[in-house]
A protein has these predicted regions:
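Pyridoxal 5′-phosphate
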Residues: 1-404
Length: 404
């Protein structure tokens, strides 16, 4: 299946590398590059501001991208789709605009131990400024959240529950709909980091019942520099702007301003229309392949890797023993070999992986691993690339002087 799409990705054709760092950023298909280039070639004007044809065309491209995202997430309205720079900015928008307005002294914010720092540090900030408490949902060693334990942590003081949809370390898909029900029963809102789920599984924010959902374009085969925040319209309407300035106003006087309606209230300044057009192309590309086909390829490759690693006594995979529960993420350690050495040796073999704490230090501390190596697969990866990874891993200890 992967070979049918390899030619769509210029970098994969031009570089002799087994690119297995897709959880950090994905490669871009030619159609995405073309969409960004075409915007600058034929539609380059400031959107939303001019009444001349170029500006109108730029506005249409930008708003068409918003509608594509709405459909991709199955949001009720395009007014619920806010363009940002990335997942980090999206979550910070919620923290500063909703969190600081609703979390008071003595309140509680509940986050999972699996969070990327982008869905942790903003809530640390909110709790610190508000005088609230930050509590953690801890997981089992395979990444499973025990909903009974979670329910016991949620109290009438809980105002926000924040959870990643898919862990960027363990690949575990979290029970978002069930978490939403528990949060809403207590009167809290649920904030979901969808950076790792959107490239791998269908997302329906209405079915998930999420109040806020954030993701980045660059992880779902789109450009860097464009991100998305979905928020329930009634919540967004009641929130103050995150940034102020041009375009996000209806009128300004010496004494104040009347802010624009959704979604533009949260999109101050010149917007990133070119990368929005690229994200639109990426979404169309993903839809043309389908998540079912992508998932089948990723699971097959994950199984191939995990089956082989299971025969290597000094190599240990974190998380579930089931390949289908990893979303293509294989985080591992090798006895006696530092993850940075693993990454450097694999790089010398033409295999690109990630090493470190993966911006999830509390999780790795909880799992008692200060650092790990991570290979993350996409549908365009091949069996030969996985075998290249496995060949390198199998010789690591010998090359480090430990013998076989």
């Amino acid at each position: 299946m992967a070979h049918a799409y390899r030619d769509d990705f210029p970098l994969l054709k031009s570089q002799d590398v087994a690119y297995l760092d897709n959880a950090a950023t994905a490669q871009r298909p030619q159609c995405v590059l073309d969409a960004v280039t075409e915007f600058y070639k034929s539609q380059n004007a400031n959107p939303l501001r001019g009444l001349y044809p170029l500006s109108i065309a730029a506005t249409e491209a930008y708003e068409n991208a918003r509608e594509a995202v709405r459909s991709f997430l199955n949001a009720k309205s395009s007014r619920e789709i806010i363009f940002t720079r990335n997942t980090t900015e999206s979550i910070n928008l919620v923290a500063y605009s909703y969190g600081l307005s609703h979390v008071k002294a003595g309140d509680e914010v509940l986050v999972s131990i699996m969070e990327h720092h982008s869905n942790l540090l903003p809530w640390q900030m909110v709790c610190r400024q508000a005088g609230a408490s930050l509590k953690f949902m801890e997981c089992e060693m395979d990444g499973t959240l025990d909903l009974n334990k979670v329910e016991a942590l949620i109290t009438p003081k809980t105002k926000i529950v924040a959870c990643t949809h898919v862990s960027n370390v363990l690949g575990r898909v979290n029970p978002i709909r069930e978490l939403a029900a528990l949060a809403h029963r207590a009167g809290a809102v649920l904030v979901v980091d969808g950076a790792q789920s959107t490239p791998h599984i269908p997302v329906d924010v209405q079915a998930l019942d999420a109040d806020f959902f954030a993701f980045s374009g660059h992880k779902v085969y789109g450009p860097m520099g464009i991100g998305v925040l979905y928020g329930r319209e009634e919540l967004l309407n009641a929130m103050p702007p995150f940034l102020t300035g041009g375009e996000m106003i209806e009128s300004v006087t010496r004494d104040g301003a009347v802010f624009a309606e959704l979604p533009h209230k949260f999109e101050a300044g010149t917007v990133n229309a070119a990368d929005a057009a690229g994200l639109h192309a990426a979404i169309d590309y993903v839809k043309s392949i389908g998540f079912t086909a992508m998932h089948q390829q990723e699971v097959a490759l994950t199984r191939r890797a995990m089956d082989a690693i299971g025969e290597m006594p000094h190599v240990h995979v974190l998380g579930s023993e089931k390949p289908e529960e990893h979303c293509g993420i294989i985080t591992f350690t090798v006895d006696g070999v530092h993850p940075h050495d693993i990454s450097e040796i694999l790089a010398s073999d033409g295999v690109a992986i990630r090493a470190g704490h993966h911006c999830a230090q509390p999780l790795l501390a909880y799992l008692k691993h200060p650092s790990t190596a991570r290979a993350s697969l996409a549908f365009y990866n091949t069996e030969s690339e996985v075998d290249r990874l496995l060949d390198s891993i199998s010789t690591l200890r010998e090359r480090m002087g430990y013998g076989k």
